[in-house]
Amino acid sequence: MSRTLTPLLDRICLPQDLRALPESDLVRLADELRTETIDAVSVTGGHLGAGLGVVELTVALHYVFNTPEDRIIWDVGHQTYPHKILTGRRDRIRTLRQEGGLSGFTKRSESVYDPFGAGHSSTSISAGLGMTVASALKAEKRRNIIAVIGDGAMSAGMAYEAMNNAGALDARLIVILNDNDMSIAPPTGAMSAHLARLVSRPAYRSLRERIKMFSKKMPKFFLDKARRSEEFARGFLVGGTLFDELGFYYVGPIDGHNLKHLLPVLKNVREYPNGPVLVHVVTHKGKGYAPAEASSDKYHGVNSFDVVTGKQIKTQSNALAYTKVFSKALIEEATHDNKIVGITAAMPTGTGLDAFAEKFPERMFDVGIAEQHAVTFAAGMACEGYKPFVAIYSTFLQRAYDQVIHDVSIQKLPVRFAIDRAGFVGADGATHAGSFDIVFLATLPEFVVMAPSDEVELMHMVRTAAAYDQGPISFRYPRGEGVGMDLPQRGELLEIGKGRVLREGSRVALVCFGTRMSEVLVAADALIAEGLSTTVADARFAKPLDKDLMRRLACEHEVLVAVEEGAIGGFGAHLLQFLAKEGLLEHGLKVRTLKFPDEYLNHGSPEKVLSRIGLDAVGIVNTVFTALGREIRTVQKVRV
């Protein structure tokens, strides 16, 4: 099917081209931009709903503000595809989230129009405030700094910390609150739009400031009463009292899809001489594309799809996804133990806890985008004898590391961490890769750190975690499907700190921590075919390490290779430290560790990226051959 014509958009290379258009053309431009966004994401997949919800806002911001001199900071970044199209990247928009292509988020190295990188939520106001203060210190001519943040991201404490600081500094910062769930705003309409225009006008604010200066000369009781009266009157009509208390001048709510409402308000706040202002904009995810508007998740994250029908093109599943295996196992354990509760930070579907919530609604807690709170909330429940499972992506657990140490680990509280999206995640790239959890958890005293080699082992670890009450315990698992194992009704209890041997050999030992085991087994077959007797061991635990097993592997083999899908400093580092302490590196043992390189891994196909860094069967065999001084030309035979 041919693409829809976009004659206005075809004239836009950069925002200065947009600003050359008359305002009367902007509605049509927004329609074309929405069409182009839908068509591009239908090819690549990605985050569609959020971007469709801010098309008019994106056009208005680049029209009113002098980007890139003025800075627009997008929180999270899911909504930035229209922004990328308008800022010189339309010719590459169909490479979104592909290896070597555009990032799915804002990225400083990608464009001058991306002043701050994103991926995790609730950072935009802090970054914007930092830029505002830096600009003032440099005595630059007045520059507008605009932070665009969603109402979901406003559930994180960091956003309020930044607003509190901005209010205290009286910094000249513009915050656009993109309320796309109607969780804050009352219904919008002509009266609301009129009031927003009225209170955003410089004359109104100037009068307000003069009254404030005059009132400071009056007695305190008069000042307090006047302030409360003004807040009541304006808050009653247009809301915003909370933001007023934080020191922000509040404007809104206004219809974020109506350019006649957006443009005058943005022009007014652009001219404010000082102080922080918050513009409350109401939008709708998936706006303008019927399949997205009708979908329960508003097409938040989609595969490639048919533009006409909206039907997503999904690959055939060969096995149950690890997330679903975790969900199944947790539900099974919860039927046996009414002390088990599930906790997630705004990711019930992504972590599989939505199914748990259907079965046990009173034992499921979604705390919003508040990972720090989630962990300490779990700690509090553990204090009272409950068994909390904090289901969280590896990348987001980083946000709560102090709570993991201070509130859980030091107190030896039995909080269970189900760490999803561990390892390389593919299209979401460096900001979402689960690279560091092994490293930052295994360094904590008496913290049990597990990783399953397949989906059956994951079920065993869920049961083991449920039964473990001596302190914190974690297990990590990747995005995507398992290997197709037949699943038992319920997992088995594992002995803490004990691995297992899958194959016995005599010359080469391959020990794997996690789901790279499928590649390890293929590599073992290839090594055996080359005449190298190979042992395969499943570590199961990075901490406590199975010292007896590791000692035996070191003493009985010429080559020992440790394999994990994580950063430097993880399982392999702990193994090497143990071997060094035991003096097992002094008698000719050739030890190699395969893990992520010392770099942030960008978006791309997991198969291709993991192959490039040597974490596939070919890389494992190459590592063994290199250790033995063998030629590696025959290795390509072992392609999976």
UniProtKB/Swiss-Prot annotation:
Mg(2+) binds at D151, N180. The keyword Calcium does not apply. Keywords: Isoprene biosynthesis, Magnesium, Metal-binding, Thiamine biosynthesis, Thiamine pyrophosphate, Transferase. Catalyzes the acyloin condensation reaction between C atoms 2 and 3 of pyruvate and glyceraldehyde 3-phosphate to yield 1-deoxy-D-xylulose-5-phosphate (DXP). GO terms for molecular function: 1-deoxy-D-xylulose-5-phosphate synthase activity; magnesium ion binding; thiamine pyrophosphate binding. This is 1-deoxy-D-xylulose-5-phosphate synthase. Its EC number is 2.2.1.7. The lineage of its organism: Bacteria, Pseudomonadati, Pseudomonadota, Alphaproteobacteria, Hyphomicrobiales. HAMAP family: DXP_synth. Thiamine diphosphate binds at H78, G119, H120, S121, G152, A153, N180, Y289, E371. Binds 1 Mg(2+) ion per subunit. Binds 1 thiamine pyrophosphate per subunit. One of its GO terms (biological process) is glyceraldehyde-3-phosphate metabolic process. It comes from Bartonella quintana (strain Toulouse). Belongs to the transketolase family. DXPS subfamily. The keyword Magnesium applies. InterPro entries: Dxylulose-5-P_synthase, THDP-binding, Transketo_C/PFOR_II, Transketolase-like_Pyr-bd, Transketolase_C, Transketolase_CS.
